[in-house]
Design a protein with these regions (language model features):
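ASCE RecA-like P-loop NTPase motor cores
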Residues: 1-531
Length: 531
């Protein structure tokens, strides 16, 4: 699978660190901290570990820029394997929010980076089709995605020599959120011209030009998406969905009925509290959304109804990139002292914002469950803590926020459960409490490495072993540095002159950088003469 290619060999403390981490994994340890000084080549050490464990790998960094740098480095180390960049695809993002103090409603605004969206879709496609995958992600990986099973099942496979119905192809492409070409050609579009079907891939920089003889697929050409230059004729083409949030709409009417039922009960709840403005607000909002979803299978903000589309219970964790990984994968937390606090804070900020939207009638209470994975849930999924030791207090707090209207909808579904297998809760197929659902998501054989020059107390206590990497491959040492207060710095310089006079090059550099201050030093010429 993984084949590391590099002109360098491990040096300094790298061989020792690689051996110790590998041995720890062989002994069954799953949580390790690599305490590596700056400049010791921790990324190269991780590349060697990836080659040794031969498992799909997820690397999480605390910002996009560092993640991009790491992805570039890993691509250089593993040119023959799938290395992906998985970060937020927004160039600009203003979340939907409401400020009660000023009565200001801020509508969601976002500018999507098509290139990064393609990277994300390609990541999901690779994880479902191969094992030699390295994903470099940011903290946004905690946010929800479409169900991995549904994403995989809704791929269009085209084979030369097979018979296809054009109307069925068009219907399936539309369902996969591909759009007919109107004006500007972009990824995730398709065009039918006579007996030719062109599909602009959502996961690759190419288009597939399919030639039909009546209903038989005669030839497939893979072409460059910009120049249209022929890359190669192919015998088959795998077309992946054009969105990462593809929803199961096979029982759409039931989902819409559930949304409408929650809306009606929420209206009654507002009216009972004398909140007529909020009641009218939520009525108009949900009715418009239902109409759009029924007609187009989509509406802006559809993610706020993910509880219904995903058939989840309140408080249950969302589907994330972790669901696309197998049970035996390698997790690397880069700069863990910075990244872990970010992972911990993601859900808290999201919940505070949703609170106002729900209380003032801009969203249904079920919107609280469109959220990132909580840190406590992440601990359980990755096996950092046993499930019975994971605190899920915030999930209980969410249930307090969920209105009695929403709870009545859930109660109604409970009564219907014995009569229907397609209920919101789908009780026979899913567990009805958060612990049980988390248990289904736990990656029992996952391994975790925390990388940091200054690991925090959390990862040090969590780790079963701490490996040090101090000596650089170059053998260079850090210079001994003394830090003094700014006040009295020139007096300190004067007091240090006997030693500094023996190191004139360093002293002259200081004087060149600070000419005005150095000119005020007493007896300057007497001390230094003409030098």
């Amino acid at each position: 699978m993984f084949q590391l290619k590099s002109a360098y060999q491990p040096a300094g403390d790298q061989p020792k660190a690689i051996a110790q981490i590998s041995e720890a994994f062989d002994q069954g340890k799953k949580k390790i901290t690599l305490l590596g000084a700056t400049g010791t080549g921790k990324t190269f050490t991780m590349a060697n570990i990836i080659q040794k464990v031969q498992q799909p790998t997820l690397v999480i960094s605390h910002n996009k820029t560092l993640a991009a740098q790491l992805a570039t480095e890993f691509k250089a180390f593993f040119p023959d394997n799938a290395v992906h960049y998985f970060v937020s695809y927004f160039d600009y993002y203003q979340p939907e929010s409401y400020l009660p103090s000023s009565g200001t409603y801020i509508e969601k605004e976002a500018t999507i980076n098509d290139e990064i969206e393609m990277y994300r879709l390609a990541t999901m496609a690779s994880l479902l089709s191969r094992k030699d995958v390295i994903v470099v992600a940011s903290a946004s990986s905690l946010y929800g995605l479409g169900q991995s099973r549904f994403f995989e099942e809704n791929c269009l496979q085209l084979y030369v020599g097979k018979k296809y119905d054009f109307n069925d192809l068009k219907r399936q492409l539309l369902h996969m959120q591909y759009k007919p070409i109107h004006g500007k050609i972009e990824k995730g579009m398709f065009e039918m011209r006579g007996d030719i079907l062109e599909i602009f891939s959502s996961t690759e920089r190419c288009l597939y030009r399919c030639f039909f003889d009546e209903e038989f697929l005669e030839r497939i050409e893979m072409r460059d998406a910009q120049s249209y230059e022929l890359k190669a004729p192919v015998q088959k083409a795998m077309i992946r969905p054009a969105t990462q949030y593809l929803q199961d709409v096979s029982d759409l009417e039931t989902i819409l009925q559930q949304m409408d039922a929650e809306k009606e009960l929420r209206i009654k709840e507002f009216e009972k509290m004398g909140m007529s403005i909020e009641a009218e607000r939520i009525k108009k909002k949900v009715e418009y959304d239902i109409r759009m979803i029924r007609e187009t299978w989509f509406v802006n903000g559809i993610e706020n109804y993910s509880l219904y589309f995903d058939q989840r219970l309140p408080g249950q964790p969302p589907n994330t990139i972790f669901d696309y990984f197998p049970e035996d994968f390698l997790m690397i937390i880069d700069e863990s002292h910075m990244t872990i606090p970010q992972l911990r804070a993601m859900a808290q900020g999201d919940r505070a914002r949703k609170n106002n939207l729900i209380r003032y009638g801009f969203r249904l209470p079920s919107a609280i469950d469109h959220r990132p994975l909580r840190f406590e849930e992440l601990e359980a999924v990755l096996g950092w803590k046993p499930l019975d030791q994971v605190a899920l207090d915030e999930a209980a707090a969410d249930l307090e926020l969920v209105s009695s209207a929403h709870q009545q909808v859930l109660a109604t579904q409970t009564e219907k459960e014995q009569k229907s297998d397609s209920s919101l809760l789908n009780r026979e197929a899913r567990k009805s409490n958060q612990h049980a659902v988390l248990a289904q998501k736990v990656k029992k054989d996952a391994k975790s490495i925390f990388l940091s020059a200054t690991p925090a107390e959390y990862e040090l206590e969590l780790s079963e072993q701490v490996v040090e990497q101090i000596i650089r491959p170059t053998g260079l040492l850090d210079p001994i540095t003394f830090v003094y207060p700014k006040s009295g710095d020139y007096q300190l310089l004067l007091d240090s002159l006997p030693k500094l006079l023996q190191k004139k090059p360093q002293l002259s550099t200081f004087l060149e950088e600070e000419p005005e201050q150095s000119a005020t030093l007493p007896n300057f010429e007497e001390l230094f003469g003409d030098e």
